[in-house]
A protein has these predicted regions:
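Sequence contexts marking disulfide-bonded cysteines in secreted/extracellular proteins
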Residues: 31, 68-76, 102-104, 111-113
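Beta-strand-rich cores of mature extracytoplasmic or soluble domains
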Residues: 86-144
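Short, solvent-exposed loop/hinge segments that bridge or flank secondary-structure elements
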Residues: 23-55, 91-107
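Boundary at the C-terminal end of the N-terminal hydrophobic targeting segment
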Residues: 18-22
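Bacterial N-terminal signal peptides
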Residues: 6-15
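N-terminal glycine/threonine-rich, aromatic-flanked beta-hairpin/loop signature
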Residues: 39-85, 123-133
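A structural signal for short, hydrophobic beta-strand segments that form beta-sheets
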Residues: 33, 82, 140-142
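Positively charged n-region of N-terminal signal peptides that target proteins for export
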Residues: 1-4
């Protein structure tokens, strides 16, 4: 009985081990999407935490910031579940699997901070397009 309980608890805790702390105010900033060769694209995003709600602005090239997701409707950004994060991570190379992801998402995309599993303070970001049942991961660089 005790062995069965320990196994069950271990299985329940396993998804949590691969999930980072949720995004917080330190993740506010400006980011640029990278292409498949990790070169910057013209698409830039700005994530801002207003109270407990994330909002996103976007711009192309050096243009003006435009509101994209302002915390309402289908564009509202919410904290992602461990199950969602696990599903998105499957689309990344094996080298990313052990790292800890904390994400926000809506119906169209997810934005994730990745904390390195063994090197404290080493952080990266991914953006996942969620379209037509497909998950398309794109790396992101922080600008500010």
């Amino acid at each position: 009985m005790t062995k069965t309980l320990l196994i069950a608890l271990g299985l329940l805790a396993a998804p949590l081990a691969a999930t980072a702390a949720p995004l917080d105010s330190s993740d506010q900033g400006e980011y640029v999407l990278l292409d498949k060769d990790e070169n910057p694209t013209p698409m830039q995003m700005q994530f801002v935490l207003q109270g407990k709600q994330w909002i996103m602005n976007g711009r192309e090239g050096g243009g003006q910031w435009q509101p994209v997701c302002q915390g309402t409707g289908e564009c509202r950004l919410v904290a992602s579940s461990a199950g969602e994060v696990s599903r998105w991570k499957k689309n990344l190379p094996d080298s990313w699997q052990p790292h800890n992801f904390g994400c926000i998402n809506n119906t169209a995309f997810a934005f994730c901070r990745v904390d390195h599993a063994s090197e404290a303070g080493r952080t990266g970001y991914w953006w996942f397009a969620l379209t037509d049942g497909r998950v398309v991961p794109l790396p992101v660089n922080r600008l500010q």
